[in-house]
């Protein structure tokens, strides 16, 4: 679980990087689609899966809206993200393993874009946050 220190670390980083959330989301999604090509199966309705495509950029933005919501609901992610969990489980039918893949890509992009802010201690806290976020999004799969 997240300690108070972890939560404060994540909130402090989010305050610094949230202005770039759209770019982070699009870059992370594009990276996931490239590095883990099996994830493309959820986006077969898109004609262009390239990093510069409008669809990738828009969905990257939506992902980061969800991350922002998670930051604001960090004290109870399971309850705070219940609607998102239901949507991904029942409507979109996303394999919950993909949340971990995307989390990894988000960590990579944040570390590239914000190397000074993303030291080892921050990395640990953000990684724990994303693990808890993935777990909360997987809640309705049980």
Swiss-Prot record:
All residue ranges annotated as the Globin domain in the record: 1-142
GO CC, alphabetical: blood microparticle; haptoglobin-hemoglobin complex; hemoglobin complex
Binding-site list for O2: 59
Coiled-coil segments on the chain, per record: none
SUPFAM superfamilies: Globin-like
Binding site for heme b: 88
Expression by tissue: Red blood cells.
Database matches in InterPro entries: Globin, Globin-like_sf, Globin/Proto, Hemoglobin_a-typ, Hemoglobin_oxygen_transport, Hemoglobin_pi
Gene Ontology molecular functions: haptoglobin binding; heme binding; iron ion binding; organic acid binding; oxygen binding; oxygen carrier activity; peroxidase activity
BP GO annotations: hydrogen peroxide catabolic process
Residues annotated with N-acetylserine modification: 1
Keywords: Acetylation, Heme, Iron, Metal-binding, Oxygen transport, Transport
Similarity comment text for this entry: Belongs to the globin family.
Other remarks on this protein: Displays a strong alkaline Bohr effect, and at low pH exhibits the reduced ligand affinity and cooperativity that comprise the Root effect.
Subunit structure: Heterotetramer of two alpha chains and two beta chains. Can form polymers.
Function description: Involved in oxygen transport from gills to the various peripheral tissues.
Stated name of the protein: Hemoglobin subunit alpha
Record organism: Chelidonichthys kumu (Bluefin gurnard)
